[in-house]
């Protein structure tokens, strides 16, 4: 578990340095979510929850702020729940499951933003978040599946 948390911290730090689309703030690759995929499919939900809590709290203390922690906890919690439930659906593969996780991660964060600002204009951002969550979620899931099949970690 320590290795996963260390890798998650490194990935979180790298993501603070990389701006995926400069014109659109807040879109991230979600590198540490590849670790969530690996943990979910290899060790189960309990390890995922512990990993996410440790990574988010430590990352928020080191690289972020209270609001970032709220957004991350909401996104991680909802996406992990969705991925856990969809893992039981036989026709959804690892990249597809991760794609749904990415989408719901962004949806949860959108609702946190709405709760904070109390303005419906935040929902104009939904199409961008839907597309970016699907794209990055699928890519991260593909990486996770690649590692799982080859037992690289």
Language model: regions and residue ranges:
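Aromatic-anchored segments of alpha-helical transmembrane domains
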Residues: 5-14, 54-64, 104-108
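Generic transmembrane alpha-helix motif of multi-pass integral membrane proteins
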Residues: 31-45, 82-87
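Short glycine-rich loop/turn motifs that provide flexible caps or phosphate-binding loops at active sites
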Residues: 7, 29-31, 43, 47, ...
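Hydrophobic, membrane-inserted alpha-helices
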Residues: 33-36, 52-59, 78-82
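Membrane-embedded alpha-helical hairpins and interfacial helices in multi-pass inner-membrane proteins
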Residues: 25, 65-70, 85-153
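Hydrophobic alpha-helical transmembrane segments
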Residues: 2-3, 34, 38, 46-53, ...
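Short helix-perturbing small/polar motifs within transmembrane alpha-helices
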Residues: 1-5, 10, 51, 72-104
